[in-house]
């Protein structure tokens, strides 16, 4: 069964949840086994469940024993439901089924997204059994900027601002129907993003967009776009070099980047380190 975690019981169970979060076979995404995020990061984010609208932590119990911890958040205006942690010591299949039933009852009409390490075989099998669609499989790569040396940059790569944003929108808009971070949403929050495009014959031949997190020590590349989705290895590497150099100068400490099979070798060549494989599932409630 699932029951709401009350604020006064947070300290009683958070250590248990964190230990599970370090084990990719027992937890979901975001992972805390990447060598970047800390125990303090986990505790701070999980505690926010008691101060943010649309968030709640559920304890998963079997025979009176707490075996799991699920922290979800709901964005009603976007009909979006996701989790910040999905940690289960035993009974992952049952936990997934019960959370699915809970979500259907409370958030009908929303899209539920659940991300897990590919190493969490029980979770992946349970999601498939519940009729979820796998919408992404990728490599989870990290960059430690202490180990990164700036590289020569191409003059064909330029930064994007509000003034020249249309160059980026021209290429990114082809994906607007398939992702949360549409061109308009990125523009609305542009101060928290680093965006670059590769210009060829006056047009964008590729674009990269990285989100800077609030403490400005960590970022994530959310995507690299190409016209008609046709991959160009040279453009990809030049865009990566530009954003890596930029964030090195800014003082960013770590970067996360999820890559597909086609681009993984180029990401590794630019200095990223792979910590595991990620799978994302989606289901309409």
What are these regions (language model features)?
Residues 172-209, 214:
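A mid-sequence, solvent-exposed acidic-amphipathic segment
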Residues 5, 13-18, 99-100, 115-117, ...:
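Gram-positive cell-envelope targeting signals
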Residues 28-98, 200, 204-233:
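Conserved donor-binding loop and adjoining core beta-sheet/short helix segment
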Residues 200-285:
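Compact recognition or signaling/catalytic modules
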Residues 1-41, 138, 148-180:
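Short amphipathic alpha-helix that is part of the acyltransferase structural core
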Residues 89-153, 239, 254-285:
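Acyl-donor-binding surface of acyltransferase catalytic domains
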């Amino acid at each position: 069964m699932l029951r709401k975690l009350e604020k006064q019981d947070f300290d009683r169970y958070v250590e248990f949840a964190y230990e599970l979060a370090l084990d990719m076979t027992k937890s979901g995404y975001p992972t805390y086994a990447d060598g970047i995020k800390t125990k303090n990061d986990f505790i701070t984010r999980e505690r926010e469940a008691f101060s943010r609208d649309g968030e709640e932590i559920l304890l998963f119990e079997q025979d009176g024993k707490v075996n799991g911890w699920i922290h979800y958040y709901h964005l009603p205006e976007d009909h979006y439901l996701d989790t910040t942690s999905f940690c289960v010591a035993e009974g992952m299949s049952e936990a997934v089924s019960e959370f699915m039933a809970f979500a259907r009852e409370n958030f009908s009409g929303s899209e539920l997204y659940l991300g897990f390490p590919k190493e969490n075989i029980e979770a992946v099998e349970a999601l498939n059994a519940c009729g979820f669609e796998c919408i992404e499989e990728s490599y989870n790569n990290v960059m430690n900027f202490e180990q990164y040396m700036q590289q020569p940059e191409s003059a064909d790569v330029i930064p994007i601002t509000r003034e020249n944003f249309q160059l980026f929108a021209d290429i990114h808009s082809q994906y607007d129907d398939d992702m949360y971070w549409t061109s308009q949403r990125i523009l609305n929050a542009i101060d928290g993003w680093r965006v670059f495009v590769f210009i060829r014959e006056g047009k964008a031949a590729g674009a990269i967009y990285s989100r800077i997190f609030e403490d400005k020590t960590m970022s994530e590349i959310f995507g690299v776009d190409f016209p008609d989705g046709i991959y160009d290895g040279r453009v990809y590497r030049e865009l990566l070099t530009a954003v890596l150099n930029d964030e090195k100068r800014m003082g960013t400490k770590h970067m996360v980047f999820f890559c597909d099979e086609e681009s993984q070798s180029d990401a590794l060549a630019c200095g990223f380190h792979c910590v595991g494989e990620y799978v994302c599932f989606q289901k309409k409630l």
